[in-house]
Amino acid sequence: MGTHGIPSAPPGRRSGPGLLVVAGAGLIGSRLADMARDSGWRIRILHRSGPGEASREGIEIDASGREHAWWAPAERILAPGALDGARAVVCLSGAPIAPRPWTPARRRALAASRLSTTALIARVAASLPPAGRPGVLLSGSATGFYGDRGDEILTEACGPGEGFLSELCLRWEAAAGPAARAGLRTVQSRTGLVVSSSGGLGRLLGAAYRVGAGARLGRGDQWQPWIGLEDAAAGLLWAIEHDDIRGPVNLTAPEPLRNRDLHRLMSRACGPPSMAVVPQVLLDRAGRTGVAGGTGSIGSMLAELLGASQRAVPQALLASGFRFTAPGAASIWGLGA
C-alpha cells in the first residue's frame, strides 16, 4: 500500500487500465501521470499538435511504455483512437491564470483554453458506444468558483459566488455536461493554491518572497485554500479510482490558511522576512472592479486570486477515506506550526 491509501503496482507492470491525461505536461497532470503509472495504470498523454499532426492515426508508444496521442482543440480535431481503451480521462487543460493581467483578450483566452478543450473531450467521450466509453471524466475547476465568502465554510454543496473566476469556473464545470448527460461519471476538481517549487501560483509566490517582494494582502483575514502537489495528484487519482465520488471535489488541504498566516509561513520559508502590506483599500477597489466586469488589471487579478476569502474544505475526499500527507501548511515548507 502506498501513501494516501492508494495501492502500489508491482514493479514493471504496464498493462493495467488506460488513463488518458490531457495537459499531461502541466504541473499537476505530469505528477498525476507518474503517480498513476506507479499504481498500475497505463498512461496515455494527449498533446497539442503541430500542423497536420492531429489527424495522425494510432497511438505512439515511447521507450518507457507511455502512450502519446495528439489533438487540436481550437479546430475541434482529436486524433482517431485517442480515447480507445481509456478507462479514465483527466482533462486539466487551461492557460495559466497568472501572472499576466486579466485584460479582455486575456480573459477570453483563459475561457477558451478551458471551455473548448473540456467540451470537446466530453462530446467525444459521450459519442462512443457505451461499451467503449471511459468510466469517468475528471475535468478541472478551481476554488475561485466560490468567490469572496468571508468566514463561511465552503463544502462542495455550496453555490457559486461573483466575479470573473466564479463565472469562469461555473462555465468550466458545465462544459463536461455532454459526458454527464450520456451517463458517464464526471468529477470536477475545484483546486486551491498548489504549493510546489516546480510551478504554478505557489512557485510564483515563492519567487516573490525570495526577492523580498512578498506582502500581506490587506488585513490578512481572508481564507486561502491551498494543497501540496503530492496531495493534489493523489487526490485526483483517488477520485478516479473511487466510483462513489462524482460531481465537484474540493482539491484543498483540510486546514485552509488566513492570508496573514500564509504570509508568515512564506516569509519564514523563503526569506528575507517581509513586513510589506498591500493596503486594504486597494484590494477593495480592485475587487469591486473585478465583480463589475472591469478591464481586468493586475489589481483585479490579485483581488480575486489572493484577496478573496475562500474557506474551502475537502469534504468529499475526507468522507471517502482519502488520507492527506500534508494537512497543515507548515509541513510543506518543513517548518514548525
Language model region names:
Residues M1-R13, A303-A337:
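C-terminal amphipathic/interface module of NAD(P)-dependent oxidoreductases
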Residues G18-D38:
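N-terminal Rossmann NAD(P)H-binding glycine-rich loop of SDR-like oxidoreductase domains
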Residues S64-T117:
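NAD(P)H-binding glycine-rich loop region in Rossmannoid oxidoreductase-like domains
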Residues T118-G163:
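Conserved Rossmann-fold NAD(P)-dependent oxidoreductase catalytic core, especially the SDR/UDP-sugar
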Residues S141-A142, A174-S197:
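Conserved beta-loop-beta element that borders a ligand/cofactor-binding pocket
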Residues A182, V195-L205, E230, A239-V249:
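Glycine/proline-rich active-site loop of Rossmann-fold NAD(P)-dependent oxidoreductases
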Residues L204-D231:
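A conserved pocket-lining segment of Rossmann-fold NAD(P)-dependent short-chain dehydrogenase/reductase
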Residues G235, H242-S297, G334-G336:
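Mid/C-terminal beta-alpha module of Rossmann-like enzyme folds, strongest
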